[in-house]
Amino acid sequence: MDVKQYLTEWSECYRKDFVENIMPFWMEHGLDRKHGGVYTCLDRDGKLMDTTKSVWFQGRFGFIAAYAYNNIEKNPEWLAASKSCIDFIEAHCFDTDGHMFFEVMEDGTPLRKRRYVFSEGFAAIAMSEYSIASGDKTYAQKALDLFNRIMYMLNTPGFLTPKYLDTMKSQGHSITMILVNTAARIRAAIDDPILTEQIDRSIKALRENFMHPEFKALLEMVGPNGEFIDNINGRLINPGHCIETAWFILEEAKYRNWDKDLVEMATTILDWSWDWGWDEQYGGIINFRDCKGFPQQDYSQDMKFWWPQCETIIAALYAYQATGDEKYLEMHKKISDWTYAHFPDKEYPEWYGYLHRDGTVAQPAKGNIFKGPFHIPRMMIRCHTLCNEILG
């Protein structure tokens, strides 16, 4: 492989696809110029199917638009889009108890709350990234304040409803891993000891509790001290989620001058998760596996969703940067070839989100409450910059 040519071509591809395809689609069809914020329930051609707004995506697109401004080009429309999402969040997305909503109507009228703090995490990274883009430090402080609020909610018994009753005490991979990225993104705008302290706690928990060498797997749910829970949910492996965790840890390793222990931990998770996730028969990263080989109960267990492919593309490139091992470039090529052959719509902009196991399209919409402008554009921005860093 001609590494220089390979990385140069991909760098240009990511930028072009983002600037000419992904971002214009969401700016034209998603951005709500009347109420502020962003719609995500868009059909294949961009037609609005549902005016319900995902609070996750007010933060996620607020982040992406500012992240693009900081890393792709200083487009004032992108900066304004980020501000629109943040303004909408501040005006409409917080309940009186400080806990954010999950869904709101187009004008911000509350619809639904959930027992998580992911809305808060996405809002915080939008504010921190906007602070970097705009130079307005008040948004960095808002992000840090919101992070402190997240920690309060997580650490105050009874504030958030637990997933299970006390008969089965457990801890989840999702919040543990997402705090690594949330804290790191905020730290880029405002440094505070609480951020690196939480990253250290999360990484310790991932290493000591969630990584299970006996299965060569990082599990989604374990006991309070990492105990293996031998039921369907305790045996669950979500390969795409684990691979996302791997690159979060690689990003932290880079921040710490390529900390060897973190690189080894992250590449171990990536290697394990690739082995569980890659579909040898049809290609692509599969949704769910059982660490003991039993059938998974989730009805989408053998489907190919957009986001695990995106996270694998990032992680493989990051692992190559960290190690120089060309096996990760081969991994990047394998997942990229499959992803780009199956997910981009050849007739309309943007990508499909949901494929059957064999790579055929399950449904053609470009967005809903869970799919919107986040994983795909983040992959393109991050990988464009990674390629350029590696090329020097």
Model-assigned labels for residue ranges:
Residues 1-392:
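Glycan-recognition and catalytic cores of secretory/periplasmic carbohydrate-active enzymes
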